[in-house]
Amino acid sequence: MKNAAVQKLSQTLEDDLPEVVRYVKNHNLGFFIPYNLNGDEKRYIPDFIACIDDGHGPDDLLNLILEVTGERKKDKAAKVSTARTLWIPAVNNEGSFGRWAFLEISDPWDAGNTIRAFLKDPDKVPEFVLK
């Protein structure tokens, strides 16, 4: 299921969202977000990073980390929480790596609508994305 979901999200980013300037499947890139699970240091490797023109212009693209939500594993909550509440605020506060955001995609077949809703109002992430 996860492979089909990842392929569908990739297709959506490629074909259906003109605001996506570029994207990459985060595979063997070395990009990870460190997190802690029960006292153990771990590495969270998100599925995609998309550079999106969200109205701030081509010189100020939004780096949107996208995670396709599959089955709920015990570490999923720790990964998502760390990315959303620690890593994103820290990298944005530091400022030299551009603007960053994080979004979980629970339904890759509706990813276009989910991403557009997020871009329209990032503070009102649909409830199904937050679970």
Model regions: which residues?
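Electrostatic, structured charged patches in enzyme active sites and in nucleic-acid/phosphate-binding
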Residues: 1-131
